[in-house]
Amino acid sequence: MNPVEFHPFEMQFEVPGTDGQTVYTRRFQAPRRLIILGCGYVAQSLCRFASQLEFDIYAADDRPSFANPYTMTNAKKVICDSFPAAIEQIHPDEQDFVAIVTRGHKHDADCIRTLYASGITPAYMGLIGSKRRVAGLFENLCTEGIDRSFLDQIHTPIGLDIGAITTDEIAISILSELILCRSRLSLWKKNGILEQTNLDPVFLNALQTKEEKAIAVVVERKGSTPVKTGAIMCVNALGQSFGTIGGGCGEHEVLRKALEVLSDKKDTFLSVDMTNDFAGEEGMVCGGTMDVIIRYVPGKVEI
């Protein structure tokens, strides 16, 4: 399947329950951008790890020996320029994650000033540095007129406290905090919207084709199952599947039911008993159940 440009879109699902139907909307989005300001050794490790966990990496530094495709090998874009100029080129928005890991607080201050001046508050901002030095930096920025409420949204010291010492360990501690924040942002909201940002591009491409398809979503699980609630799979009329709900006999049963949905052109609900099932190719024995909603999506006719 040829890659296509991905445009965010939403899809509604109705989940049967004891008190009637629960309707929620899933918003399919491209992976979140992680903007790494600074391309030193911690940043290089962070870039390497984060790119494997569905972040699109944008990196910047003013040193050519650090800001290049050879040091930030997995970055989608690397900018060698002053930090204020780089931030203006990247255009951070409310969905972005920003990790400020420059080589000194002079550059940290430049980054924070530029972010504040943009009028945009990213979904996540983190700053590397000791509590004492960061406190002094924030005090100086406050005297310049930067709102304290903006500074209070910056995670500092950046990363979860896992006792990190080495460069890779520090990067992992930062990534752990990024994952935690991303997961919290993707939880159910009061308006019933569940964000989906970390899907396989092949699946997203399949979802956007004009052909009819069936979308299977795990909406409830009990016991030991190979995937979490929210796992999703797309099936076309040829029986090709994209994405996974865990493999094994359970997925095969859902695939068979999805073909029936395509034939009947009607949504359905399926409870899959996975007792003694083997998940995927790993030989993992499952002993739980999964409730799966399968929605019919008609094809689009070009006029």
Task: Give each language-model segment a name.
Residues 1-62, 69-71, 96, 140, ...:
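Segments forming oxygen-rich coordination pockets for charged ligands
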Residues 55, 120, 146:
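Short phosphate-binding/catalytic loops that engage adenosine nucleotides
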Residues 60, 97-108, 113-140:
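ADP-ribose/adenylate-binding Rossmann-like module
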Residues 65-69, 133-136:
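Short, charged/polar "capping" segments at the starts of alpha-helices
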Residues 70-76, 144:
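Short, conserved SAM-binding/catalytic segment
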Residues 76-82:
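Conserved SAM-binding strand-loop segment of SAM-dependent methyltransferases
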Residues 83-93:
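Short amphipathic alpha-helix with an adjacent loop that forms part of the alpha/beta core around
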Residues 128-200:
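Adenosine-phosphate binding glycine-rich loop
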